[in-house]
Amino acid sequence: MNQFFITSINIIKKQEQMEFLIGFFTEYGYWAVLFVLIICGFGVPIPEDITLVSGGVIAGLYPENVNSHLMLLVSMIGVLAGDSCMYWLGRIYGTKILRFRPIRRIVTLQRLRMVREKFSQYGNRVLFVARFLPGLRAPIYMVSGITRRVSYVRFVLIDFCAAIISVPIWIYLGELGAKNLDWLHTQIQKGQIVIYIFIGYLYYSFLEMEKI
């Protein structure tokens, strides 16, 4: 019962967030989408999927002013820019960045240790999976910079390959359901379930590869 109540609260919060973002994006257009996606990369508690869907919604509502394909391009730039910022903060400042209180809230020592263990265990594959893990994405990208295990070019290529799977789906889903938000919220929940299944499949594949 408690879990059902918590889930209901989360759904309501996401609906409110989407309504706010749709209004914000309608007012300020592509630049607003770019800005929000970049700060999402810093671990700000704004769901990236809701942000992308909201960008797609305004493309569906105002096709004469907003092009969905251009929205996809802007979104990809925003996603990669936000992720790159976390990488470079880690690469430039190293563990010193953890002295900065806002960063310390995102990248705790416990998360830092856990991410380092995952890197040792799975290598660069962790970067690909990180794109689908909202709570761990920022710490993983920052640690990849801190440890310097991967060059920036390789980092961007891996991040791009992961982003090009999810970003278009959310953008075009938002465009498709722009005039039926109730249906859209249902599809978002289904999409999130598919992502969790995909992550589980990747995790299982990694375990199988280790046995070989």
Curated annotation (Swiss-Prot):
Residues passing through the membrane, by range: 20-40, 70-90, 155-175, 192-212
Gene Ontology CC: one annotated term: plasma membrane
Keyword Transmembrane helix included in the entry's annotation: yes
Source organism superkingdom: Bacteria
Keywords, sorted A to Z: Cell membrane, Membrane, Transmembrane, Transmembrane helix
Subcellular location: Cell membrane
Membrane topology label: Multi-pass membrane protein
One Pfam family it belongs to: VTT_dom
Family: Belongs to the DedA family.
Matching PANTHER family: INNER MEMBRANE PROTEIN DEDA-RELATED, INNER MEMBRANE PROTEIN YABI
Protein name from the UniProt record: Uncharacterized membrane protein HI_1629
Taxonomic source organism: Haemophilus influenzae (strain ATCC 51907 / DSM 11121 / KW20 / Rd)
Lineage summary: Bacteria, Pseudomonadati, Pseudomonadota, Gammaproteobacteria, Pasteurellales
